[in-house]
């Protein structure tokens, strides 16, 4: 079944219909020789094993084979999860430990995703864009090329309440730390959003906005460009 991940109602339908998952990992001491594992993955030999599987199946397995088990320790990090984490191995970007990136996210070449960043389903991150520490990009948020999203900043998602219009951050925009871009807002190319601002309406290209709610305070000039320089070396 296919889904349109640019539509909030389609994303919601996907979350409703997809099979939910509660994966677990088990460190087990015992003798599992000849034991039927079903769909459980098992690695090890002699008297030590590591098992991977769904919670219900693993629980049944442990109960049915308790006479063969000396001890075990179970780890679990989610419950009835609908959307897995994005597979990162083939992405040409720098993604630091601790970033949380859901599946169905697009990340452009040479982007940088820092520790603690959270990126939800359907988001798009452009080439050479940096998402700094603890920044949040909600469902379907779109960041262009060479954007800097400051630490703790939020680009609101448009999944609930549903909206046809996502947040759009155009190329070469700098968003300061802890700024908030509300649902459906568009930030024009080359603009700067001051730290701590709350942006409630569209921002044209080439301006600086600040405050709560954010207002235009000036046009981007050479002094502004010097203070908001993007460093290519961080994106190599």
Curated annotation (Swiss-Prot):
Keywords attached to this entry: Acyltransferase, Amino-acid biosynthesis, Diaminopimelate biosynthesis, Lysine biosynthesis, Repeat, Transferase
Taxonomic superkingdom: Bacteria
GO BP: diaminopimelate biosynthetic process; lysine biosynthetic process via diaminopimelate
CDD domains: LbH_THP_succinylT
SUPFAM superfamilies: Trimeric LpxA-like enzymes (SSF51161)
Catalytic activity, EC: 2.3.1.89
Molecular-function annotations in GO: tetrahydrodipicolinate N-acetyltransferase activity
Pathway(s) per entry: Amino-acid biosynthesis; L-lysine biosynthesis via DAP pathway; LL-2,6-diaminopimelate from (S)-tetrahydrodipicolinate (acetylase route): step 1/3
Reactions performed catalytically: (S)-2,3,4,5-tetrahydrodipicolinate + acetyl-CoA + H2O = L-2-acetamido-6-oxoheptanedioate + CoA
Role according to the record: Catalyzes the transfer of an acetyl group from acetyl-CoA to tetrahydrodipicolinate.
Name of the protein in question: 2,3,4,5-tetrahydropyridine-2,6-dicarboxylate N-acetyltransferase
Organism of this sequence: Clostridium perfringens (strain SM101 / Type A)
Lineage: Bacteria, Bacillati, Bacillota, Clostridia, Eubacteriales
Gene name for this UniProt entry: dapH
